[in-house]
A protein has these predicted regions:
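Histidine-centered active-site loop/cap adjacent to the catalytic His
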Residues: 330-378
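Low-complexity, acidic Ser/Thr/Pro-rich repeat tracts that form intrinsically disordered stalk/linker regions
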Residues: 31-79, 83
Length: 517
């Protein structure tokens, strides 16, 4: 929790999946801090309040932890304390899926699966102590003031925050929560994967109709959780500006383009078990809707927002350099296997947490209130962008035809043709221009860029999507008059001959078919 900085197998899988990929932890006693904090007067934003005493049970724990930190149990003034960072939330940030777990959190009576390699322990933010109090399976009720414990030996997460805030000087509070509330992301994933194993058909038709309602239901719960964390910090004597409160969204662990991986191992060996169309639905619909909900909660509550929804694009399960763990069955813990045997599946792996840590480090240094993070050039190194992806992607409309540049069939695999189509606002018609790399990314995935195949800069060459690489044949310049030209062949322009023609290179002639807005 706290650390100083540094055939039969198939049937077993199916049976285990049917139980759950992510197990909702049992709810035990109610936080003993409820009366002390839930009704406490809240200081005005930007002003520190007097420190409110903890209830005896929590004060005892605080004193014990202080003695370990400093050699005595005294509560010190802020300026005399060690600095710290803390993460709260669920399996996405606890370290579930990494494979290395802190003692006491890897079963059999506690499955929080906190990893010493989780993101909060690996940032470049200068801090003396890092706390990871997130727990796999947590919902907002396990985090909020007066909430419920997940396990008998766990505190409500806001109580852990209250203790850390009094013993150290917190610089950043990170919250990743919402997936286990109305959304029930784990059970949905369980169902989708199980249906694939049992040949029962895709899960998209089952969940699409009610998905937005699920998102709408979780938004006020996440927003209320942010408010509670603010209250806990004010009760500990912090002004709102004394620390950074960050809400991070969830990346998609799966995608439909796995066969583009030249070393694709197959779905079962690679762990990307599920219908390809369901993977596309998850990436293109389910996760983006969830992200918008988390963003709304962060914005409405005044938290700093980090959009990580596109962070794993190009690094999904079964892709090269994957940042997420695929379907994984631990046959030895527990034994005999049960629902907990597969709970590590479809979560960030150690590389994924390294990516989170990099994004958080950049966000803290940038001082932004809202930013997005992704590996836009397939370098393996995440980069922070001072934009919200929701606002960055826009349709590209042709001046002559009025049609929009469109990835054919809403596909995103390598070689997908690009042309004109009736403007419809879908993600296969959203585009973002990366100023640094001069690349045009399609909204479907951060990892597919407009590409001149084989770098053949010639009249009539058709444009396609391809894995973003930063290569010269994926670099374009936007010239006066709305033309778009290959950086390596600026006498040629992107051209739409008719409303639904393929997008081609043609000699620049100033015609409306070569102008885009």
């Amino acid at each position: 929790m706290m650390r100083p900085r540094r055939g039969r197998r198939l049937m077993t899988v199916v049976a285990t999946l049917a139980a759950a990929l992510t197990v909702s932890a049992s709810m035990g006693g109610v936080s003993t801090a409820a009366e002390a904090t839930a009704t406490a007067a809240v200081a005005a934003p930007g002003s520190a309040a007097a420190v409110k005493p903890l209830p005896p049970e929590l004060e005892k724990i605080r004193a014990q932890q202080a003695a370990k930190l400093y050699g005595d149990p005294a509560e010190r003034p802020l300026g005399e304390r060690k600095t710290s960072l803390i993460s709260l939330g669920d399996s996405e940030i606890s370290g579930e899926g990494v494979g290395t777990y802190e003692p006491g959190t890897d079963g059999p009576t506690n499955w929080c699966h906190r990893s010493p390699d989780s993101a909060i322990h690996r940032t470049g933010i200068a801090a003396d102590v890092t706390y990871n109090v997130a727990c796999s399976g947590a919902y907002t009720g396990n985090i909020r003031i007066g909430g419920s414990k997940q396990y008998a030996d766990e505190l409500v997460q806001s109580d852990s925050l209250a203790i850390a805030a009094r013993n150290t000087r917190l610089k950043m509070v990170l919250l990743v929560a919402g997936a286990n509330d109305d959304l029930q992301f784990g059970p949905v994933m369980t169902d989708c994967v199980t249906r694939w194993f049992l040949l029962q058909g895709t899960c998209e038709p089952k969940y699409t109709p009610g998905w937005q309602a699920r998102v709408d239901g979780l938004v006020p719960k996440v927003e209320g959780t942010v408010g509670d964390l603010r209250t806990v910090m004010r009760d500990a004597g912090y002004a709102d500006g004394d620390y950074k409160l960050v809400v991070m969204s969830y990346p998609s662990p799966i995608g439909p383009d796995v066969t583009d991986n030249p070393n694709f191992p197959g779905k079962i060996p690679g762990g990307c078990t599920g219908y390809t169309s369901d993977s596309a639905w998850g990436r293109n619909t389910a996760v983006p809707a969830f992200e918008k909900g988390v963003r709304k909660a962060a914005t409405d509550s005044g938290a700093t927002y980090l959009d990580a929804s596109r962070l794993f694009h190009g690094h999904e399960v079964c892709m090269e350099d994957t940042w997420a763990r695929g379907l994984y069955v631990n046959i030895s813990n527990p034994f005999p296997p049960d629902a907990n045997s597969v709970r590590q599946s479809f979560h960030p792996n150690a590389r994924g947490h390294g990516a989170f840590a990099s994004c958080l480090t950049q966000l803290y240094a940038a001082g932004l209130r809202e930013a997005s993070c992704a590996d836009s050039a397939s370098t393996g190194q995440p980069k922070l962008y001072p934009v919200a992806w929701d606002d960055a992607y826009r349709p590209v409309k042709n001046a002559a035809t009025g049609s929009c540049v469109d990835a054919n069939g809403a596909a995103s695999g390598n070689g997908t043709a690009v042309g004109g189509w009736d403007c419809n606002g879908q993600r296969n018609q959203g585009w973002w221009y990366d100023q640094e790399h001069r690349s045009l990314h399609v909204e479907l995935t951060q990892d597919r860029c407009l590409d001149v195949p084989g770098a053949r800069y010639e009249r009539g060459a058709g444009l396609i999507l391809w894995n973003c690489s930063g290569a010269a044949n994926q670099q374009f310049v936007r010239a006066d008059g709305g033309t778009v030209r290959p950086a390596a062949a600026q006498s040629l322009c992107l051209t739409l001959g008719a409303a639904k023609d393929p997008l081609r290179l043609q000699p620049c002639d100033g015609s409306a078919g070569q102008r885009f807005a």
